[in-house]
Amino acid sequence: MHPRFQTAFAQLADNLQSALAPILADHHFPAMLTAEQVSTLKNTAGLDEDALAFALLPLAATCARTDLSHFNVGAIARGVSGNWYFGANMEFLGATMQQTVHAEQSAISHAWLRGEKGLAAVTVNYTPCGHCRQFMNELNSGLDLRIHLPGRAPHTLRDYLPDAFGPKDLEIKTLLMDEQDHGFTLTGDTLTQAAITAANKSHMPYSHSPSGVALECKDGRIFTGSYAENAAFNPTLPPLQGALNLLSLNGYDYADIQRAILAEKGDAALIQWDATAATLKALGCHNIDRVLLG
């Protein structure tokens, strides 16, 4: 078990601990539960879906990287597949505050990058900020997405974001978590191809500036992130943050990164290179390359 889980795990009910122990035994537990695992945990612990999600929130919150605020937020995105995806907030010392990943963004990006096709609900331990409410409005689940908070009745995103502005106001038909493939040819080595594949998945209907990042760890593991734009622009999630989020959720640290590649178009309206390189260097990674999509 990764050390970050130990304190929260010890506070769980005994029957839930017994069911979770084999799942968490892997130091690189992927911070997700399959539909089958969720069903087993519900039956073993005698909890319904909502109660189980609340019980697991402290585990998700331990995944936070909050070197600046020291305020851990955890979230669980529940996919329409039945799979559950942990998320937690991330802050990057030496970078800028704009590089921060919110817990809801973390869980949603986690689900999207693992191939989830849509979300039924998001469970979070603190009220979603306006930034996250707007981010969630880009999803193909729209305003019907259920939001679950401790001590409150569940509500839809529509309740939390009245008079919402979103992609439909801009006549955008393809939404975040809809399947997309922009068709860029895979070239280069394995890491380069992973970055291009991530760029092919980009949700960028506003700038038409695809980008993807691939991070290679010292043990050979590769994590990728795809660019996810938002109708309100500022809640957009850069590809590096998606990749760093997956890396951290899987129990790796920034020091484990040995190489990074950004894939983007050289003539795009928006360029990720400077911000990507600056953030990676702040985290100690200097082996950074760029491949141009064509």
Curated annotation (Swiss-Prot):
It comes from the Bacteria. One of its GO terms (molecular function) is cytidine deaminase activity. Pfam families: dCMP_cyt_deam_1, dCMP_cyt_deam_2. Substrate binds at residues 89-91. The active site is at 104 (proton donor). Binds 1 zinc ion. GO terms for cellular component: cytosol. Zn(2+) binds at residues 102, 129, 132. GO terms for biological process: cytidine deamination. InterPro entries: APOBEC/CMP_deaminase_Zn-bd, CMP_dCMP_dom, Cyd/dCyd_deaminase_Zn-bd, Cyt/Deoxycyt_deaminase, Cyt_deam_dimer, Cytidine_deaminase-like, Cytidine_deaminase_bacteria. Its cofactor is Zn(2+). Its EC number is 3.5.4.5. Residues 48-168, 186-294 form the CMP/dCMP-type deaminase domain. It catalyses: cytidine + H2O + H(+) = uridine + NH4(+); 2'-deoxycytidine + H2O + H(+) = 2'-deoxyuridine + NH4(+). Keywords: Hydrolase, Metal-binding, Zinc. Belongs to the cytidine and deoxycytidylate deaminase family. HAMAP family: Cyt_deam. Homodimer. PANTHER family: CYTIDINE DEAMINASE. This enzyme scavenges exogenous and endogenous cytidine and 2'-deoxycytidine for UMP synthesis. This is Cytidine deaminase. It comes from Salmonella dublin (strain CT_02021853). The lineage of its organism: Bacteria, Pseudomonadati, Pseudomonadota, Gammaproteobacteria, Enterobacterales. The gene is cdd.
